Amino acid sequence: MEIGSAGPAGAQPLLMVPRRPGYGTMGKPIKLLANCFQVEIPKIDVYLYEVDIKPDKCPRRVNREVVDSMVQHFKVTIFGDRRPVYDGKRSLYTANPLPVATTGVDLDVTLPGEGGKDRPFKVSIKFVSRVSWHLLHEVLTGRTLPEPLELDKPISTNPVHAVDVVLRHLPSMKYTPVGRSFFSAPEGYDHPLGGGREVWFGFHQSVRPAMWKMMLNIDVSATAFYKAQPVIQFMCEVLDIHNIDEQPRPLTDSHRVKFTKEIKGLKVEVTHCGTMRRKYRVCNVTRRPASHQTFPLQLENGQTVERTVAQYFREKYTLQLKYPHLPCLQVGQEQKHTYLPLEVCNIVAGQRCIKKLTDNQTSTMIKATARSAPDRQEEISRLVRSANYETDPFVQEFQFKVRDEMAHVTGRVLPAPMLQYGGRNRTVATPSHGVWDMRGKQFHTGVEIKMWAIACFATQRQCREEILKGFTDQLRKISKDAGMPIQGQPCFCKYAQGADSVEPMFRHLKNTYSGLQLIIVILPGKTPVYAEVKRVGDTLLGMATQCVQVKNVIKTSPQTLSNLCLKINVKLGGINNILVPHQRPSVFQQPVIFLGADVTHPPAGDGKKPSIAAVVGSMDAHPSRYCATVRVQRPRQEIIQDLASMVRELLIQFYKSTRFKPTRIIFYRDGVSEGQFRQVLYYELLAIREACISLEKDYQPGITYIVVQKRHHTRLFCADRTERVGRSGNIPAGTTVDTDITHPYEFDFYLCSHAGIQGTSRPSHYHVLWDDNCFTADELQLLTYQLCHTYVRCTRSVSIPAPAYYAHLVAFRARYHLVDKEHDSAEGSHVSGQSNGRDPQALAKAVQIHQDTLRTMYFA
């Protein structure tokens, strides 16, 4: 992949993504199967046509119906026996050219509409170019280099896109497509999630170029859809109403707001017009019930009168509303005042839920979808057999052959690093299957805690004083064993209630106890108090806080207390453990800074909240201590807008902490999808360089830019049962793959660095987009695996390198800093809580960390 010049005069050099420097050899070989299936493609040219459908802006489903109807209708004159494939937008491919003039052809197509009304469309088809699969073979086998991919080159001329469209054509007609997955309504089984939502199962399918061949990646997939049901039932599920007939009163304000939030944007169909099931999109819920909600009705004599919705339905449809006390749905355009009583509407089937699931729904979803690795492997194999690609007429038309057995891959299990602890006996821990423990070990550098406070936001009934006393005694014992002694009793221990009391209490503590190191906050479950504690502690007063759920105070376990100590020690400037120095890769021989970066976006369907960009940087040579920077930026923008100034801040902090200037920058970037690689790399690599040059004009450290991806569907399974690990039968921690299923010539690899506990482990995918430091495959794979062992919050190796994980935590914490107190106290009648309508300066200030907290790992 190459990046076209985009400078003022096109002066920027082409950025060539590095080629693979060779293959890794370290580690113990392991035989694996991957859910990738080889696709054999003929060495032919296919023909690309541009399709233009008017009226445009129709959903892809409708476009597909139009094209399907067109192919049937013009079979004799144009299409003959050809079976074109279509991507649902503007690209149509055929195996043989169509008899159309170079200027194109215009066709009229009609689809049957609702209620006997036909829908007319105008379709124009125009030849664009040939697409060569012969060239694709040459690139896959390494015989020719691909031409530079310019930023503005259309995807439709890409031969890989053509392969993808062929394989997706039939499933797109049969199922409900969502992204790269296909779903169908549950038949004979039911997986309700509550709140009017349910689980639909389906499969993911995507085509990827691999070494010497094209691979089809197939995986089982599940997502939440809205249940097709009467709107009244939907409302009852959302509001936890067990029997609507026992609710003769109108909805309360807070109920109406909650219901509006859930149903807004959904499609409903009406039931009061016989077979004419007209569909509408909901834009609001009325404040007034159907018995009082009025609208201007035009009579036959031209006069306009006010009618209530209930009256209108009685007069027009002789329908006496059963629930006139309930509100109406406002549908279509806001200004048009179209109202429908809830009882004549059903939720339209097949609508995917894009809104965020609640915690309960998420946990139900995980339980319904988690499969042990062997079960998932079996399910995927079943899927591929039932997909029966050899009978797919479109796959046949283009002469594809899809193998129905998983790809055999040889991976390697990398050696785990040893971890150095402190104390008198300076013990070393050796992880086994990605896990180790603290028993008999002390922190590498433990903090002594002399002055600390407790604020209990659980009630005295929930958490009596003797329970608190027991908890502090246990915590002090475990902290002493861990080498982080908490001395004496807390200087302050009080009960408090509600988020409003956080700030005054913390101010009192700050003013009264100089040298206060830590406030332990006890929370009564999920509460707005948490966000307020973090806002006041992190941004307003600069005080270290550690929250604990009351259930863990009432019933203490050594494991929970030990995990608390891991977090507390780091927040107060301690070091839990370090990588044993002699086993680290050679990149550590000179000063090096590790950066992790992530952007988190607001939940789908929320256009007002900003996206949050976070970048963290290591501050020592181990690397164990990190410093954070965070910014708010335009919603849904993936590029980190202010990266240059964030990296500059971190380089300055690194210099202050170590008195060295890094000669190398290793940048792990989370959350970028393949389609965005080029734009993001182009902007961000230049921003990192700009940060360096702004400090000293000749300062040019070597930069390595690595994208970390977890949101992909490649899964690896042990070919030999005896190699499976744990109850879920997963691949061992440290399993690495950089052959067969990886990119034909770019530098990428899969690494599963964690031990799978539930379900099937998902290996992380690493793609090196820039490398001034000329890493070998072994060096970078080992470095990445070692960094997965340096995450301070647990004694396990995690699934992505610590810096990338910390960036995610920092961005997540900033979401809490943005919560408005006044909005979040309860579900009031105003729009719920975050950062709505606040100006950019106020948002930027809200996520700004207090000077005293800035250099600590407050996010741990």
From Swiss-Prot:
Binding positions for a divalent metal cation per the UniProt entry = 598, 638, 670, 808
Q: Could you tell me which CDD domains the record lists for this protein?
A: PAZ_argonaute_like, Piwi_ago-like
List GO terms (cellular component aspect): condensed nuclear chromosome; cytoplasm; cytoplasmic ribonucleoprotein granule; cytosol; membrane; nucleoplasm; nucleus; P-body
- The catalytic activity of this protein is classed by the Enzyme Commission as 3.1.26.n2
- The set of disulfide-linked cysteines is none
SMART domains tied to this protein: DUF1785 (SM01163), PAZ (SM00949), Piwi (SM00950)
Gene Ontology MF terms in the entry: double-stranded RNA binding; endoribonuclease activity, cleaving miRNA-paired mRNA; metal ion binding; miRNA binding; RNA binding; RNA endonuclease activity; single-stranded RNA binding
> What does the record list as GO biological process?
miRNA processing; miRNA-mediated gene silencing by inhibition of translation; mRNA catabolic process; positive regulation of gene expression; positive regulation of non-canonical NF-kappaB signal transduction; pre-miRNA processing; regulation of stem cell proliferation; regulatory ncRNA-mediated post-transcriptional gene silencing
- Leading EC class: hydrolase
Major localisation: cytoplasm
Q: Which UniProt keywords apply?
A: Acetylation, Cytoplasm, Endonuclease, Hydrolase, Metal-binding, Nuclease, Phosphoprotein, Ribonucleoprotein, RNA-binding, RNA-mediated gene silencing, Translation regulation, Ubl conjugation
Specify whether Glycoprotein is a keyword of the entry.
no
Q: Which SUPFAM superfamilies match?
A: PAZ domain, Ribonuclease H-like
> Which parts of the sequence belong to the PAZ domain?
230-349
Q: How is it modified after translation?
A: Ubiquitinated on surface-exposed lysines by a SCF-like E3 ubiquitin-protein ligase complex containing ZSWIM8 during target-directed microRNA degradation (TDMD), a process that mediates degradation of microRNAs (miRNAs). Ubiquitination by the SCF-like E3 ubiquitin-protein ligase complex containing ZSWIM8 leads to its subsequent degradation, thereby exposing miRNAs for degradation. ZSWIM8 recognizes and binds AGO3 when it is engaged with a TDMD target.
Asked if the record carries the keyword Disulfide bond, the reply is no
The UniProt entry, under PROSITE patterns, shows: PAZ, PIWI
The subcellular localization recorded is:
Cytoplasm, P-body
Concerning InterPro entries, the annotation shows: AGO3, ArgoL1, ArgoL2, Argonaute_Mid_dom, Argonaute_N, PAZ_dom, PAZ_dom_sf, Piwi
| Subunit structure comment from the entry | Interacts with EIF4B, IMP8, PRMT5 and TNRC6B. Interacts with APOBEC3F, APOBEC3G and APOBEC3H. Interacts with EDC4.
Protein family per UniProt? Belongs to the argonaute family. Ago subfamily.
Quote the function comment for this protein.
Required for RNA-mediated gene silencing (RNAi). Binds to short RNAs such as microRNAs (miRNAs) and represses the translation of mRNAs which are complementary to them. Proposed to be involved in stabilization of small RNA derivates (siRNA) derived from processed RNA polymerase III-transcribed Alu repeats containing a DR2 retinoic acid response element (RARE) in stem cells and in the subsequent siRNA-dependent degradation of a subset of RNA polymerase II-transcribed coding mRNAs by recruiting a mRNA decapping complex involving EDC4.
Descriptive protein name: Protein argonaute-3
Its source organism is Homo sapiens
Native organism taxonomy: Eukaryota, Metazoa, Chordata, Craniata, Vertebrata
